[in-house]
Design a protein with these regions (language model features):
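Ser/Thr-rich, Proline-interspersed low-complexity disordered segments
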Residues: 243-295
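Solvent-exposed N-terminal domain segments of exported/luminal and surface proteins
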Residues: 1-48, 54
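Short beta-strand elements of extracellular/lumenal beta-sandwich folds
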Residues: 106-128, 132, 138
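Beta-strand elements of well-folded, non-transmembrane domains
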Residues: 28-32, 124-126, 211
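Low-complexity, intrinsically disordered segments enriched in Ser/Thr together with acidic residues
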Residues: 1-16, 184-217, 224
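Serine/threonine-rich, low-complexity linker/repeat segments that form flexible spacers/stalks
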Residues: 81-118
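Short beta-strand elements
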Residues: 30-88, 232-242
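Solvent-exposed beta-hairpin/edge-strand motifs
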Residues: 133-166
């Protein structure tokens, strides 16, 4: 299955996902981009290599059909499609000039009186250090339920796949812990397992829960997998002190799951092939410092 898209059948079954929207995403990569950017810093943009397109899905469970329903949105990652539904999506760059970027997305809905649904999406565009932990602040006395996590499945290992021992990356769900002031999801550290299920480049993970308090401005804390200090990013969370809104909104809009990231070299004008919720296996080209070469 090397160099192919791998998804859970249950994620693309139309009957099991009523109302779902599907997007195919492509990354257009050039081995020479980093070198060119080093000599042309004022002209370089290493963050416009992604494009996406919406598709409808039919068929299953053995064969699926993907039909485009809109034109390609060029030079933007697919998480930006979520912003069109009312979500907030922000770009984060922990080490400008030395590493890539990731995106923090979030949306809060009020599906019934006294219940608020919190959805968070973390997308690693080209951040070599990867993401290992995500923590959301909670107010005193907040009751949390329906805690959820979603990550795309990883490919099994194969010879010279670039992972430690050719074992492939782990697909183990992240651990979740809660105390009086926060809820935290995390995978193993790099020191514990170099093949841990970190959020690597071109991959999006989802986190969610319900709470009995309305949203307030807060900070989430993200810890990185390979290197770097923790980073705080603005979100909304049930931190307390707000006035509950009695009018419920529609049921919670599902966060986009990880989108396909083929690694073919092309110009950004190419139309990405429909690919649901994949997990890219090869390492990214340098973003923007030299990193080990992509594995086959």
């Amino acid at each position: 299955v090397s160099h192919r898209i791998l998804v859970e059948t249950s994620d693309v079954m139309p009957s099991g996902n009523p109302g779902a929207s599907y997007f195919g995403e492509a990354a257009y990569l050039s081995a020479h981009e980093y070198t060119w950017c080093q000599s042309h810093p004022a002209e370089c943009n290493m963050f416009n290599n992604y494009s996406y397109r919406q598709f409808s899905v039919s068929g299953g469970p053995t064969f699926f059909n993907f039909s485009p329903v809109s034109s390609t949105v060029r030079m933007q990652p697919a998480i930006q499609a979520w912003a069109a539904t009312g979500a907030t999506v922000n770009q984060a760059e922990p080490d400008p000039g030395n590493d890539g970027i990731w995106f923090m997305g979030y949306k809060v809905t009020n599906p019934s009186a006294g219940v608020w649904h919190y959805e968070y999406a973390l997308f690693n565009m080209n951040l070599d250090r990867s993401i290992q932990s995500f923590s959301v602040s909670l107010g005193a006395g907040v009751n949390v339920s329906n805690v959820g996590f979603h990550a795309p499945p990883q490919h099994p290992g194969w010879a010279q796949d670039g992972t430690q021992g050719d074992a492939g990356y782990s697909s183990a769900p992240w651990n979740v812990t809660q105390d009086a002031s926060s809820i935290t999801w995390n995978t193993e550290t790099f020191a514990q397992n170099q093949n841990a299920n970190a959020i690597r480049w071109g991959t999006l993970y989802n986190f969610r829960f319900d709470a009995d308090q309305p949203p307030q401005g807060a900070n989430a804390t993200v810890e990185f997998f390979k290197t770097g200090s923790p980073m705080m990013v603005p979100i909304q969370a049930p931190t307390g002190g707000g006035t509950p809104t009695p009018t419920p909104t529609a049921t919670a809009t599902a966060t986009p799951t990880a989108t396909a990231t083929p690694t073919a070299t092309a110009t950004p004008t190419a139309t990405p092939t429909p690919r649901p919720t994949p997990t890219p296996r090869s390492s990214p080209p340098p973003r923007p410092r030299p990193t080990p070469p992509p594995r086959p």
